[in-house]
């Protein structure tokens, strides 16, 4: 009884900085990802109930993916790290990177990425009316748009509602760490 009530009372609304942008080389990256997904294997059950969830270190030697991950790391550095008062210079490293293919009925349950500093989602293939990325604490919804990236502190709980359409909704996701 009491523990349940306490957990409801302890919900905190976070005023976290969420970075949303459009990747300059989206057309080239998206074409490459769609091609590579033809050969990807599904890792099975995760908190993402997608028809395909690639491995956690997907396409580590693909130059377009390497460039994209470098871009995301630089966005994190410029949007978050320059605000730190610390005299130490941190490097931002991509810890893992994967793809998700959502088909009708697929979703992602509420989760976070607490073992990491930052996370991101990137829309490879989606319509504006497809399921959004939803941050639970604020109820902020980020509508999909091909080429759009969303970077956020990894502690933010988020989910993706059930995909209701017959076409695929395809995303890339990743987690990043800070190292000295």
Residue ranges of each PLM-predicted region?
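Short, Lys/Arg-enriched N-terminal segments with co-localized hydrophobic residues
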Residues: 1-9
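Catalytic core of non-heme Fe(II) oxygenases with the double-stranded beta-helix
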Residues: 85, 90-162, 167-171, 175-180
């Amino acid at each position: 009884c009491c523990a349940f009530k306490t957990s409801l009372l302890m919900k905190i609304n976070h005023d976290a900085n969420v970075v949303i942008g459009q990747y300059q080389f989206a057309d080239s990256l998206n074409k490459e990802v769609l091609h590579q997904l033809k050969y990807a294997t599904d890792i099975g059950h995760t908190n993402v109930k997608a028809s395909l969830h690639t491995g956690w270190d997907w396409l580590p030697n693909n130059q377009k993916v390497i460039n994209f991950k470098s871009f995301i790391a630089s966005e994190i550095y410029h949007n978050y790290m320059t605000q730190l008062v610390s005299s130490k210079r941190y490097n931002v490293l991509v810890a893992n990177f994967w793809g998700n293919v959502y088909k009708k009925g697929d979703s992602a349950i509420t989760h976070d990425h607490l073992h990491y500093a930052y996370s991101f989602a990137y829309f490879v293939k989606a319509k504006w009316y497809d399921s959004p990325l939803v941050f639970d604490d604020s109820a902020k919804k980020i509508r999909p748009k091909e080429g759009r990236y969303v970077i956020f502190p990894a502690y933010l709980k988020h989910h993706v509602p059930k995909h209701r359409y017959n076409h695929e909704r395809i995303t890339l996701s990743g987690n990043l760490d800070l190292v000295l």
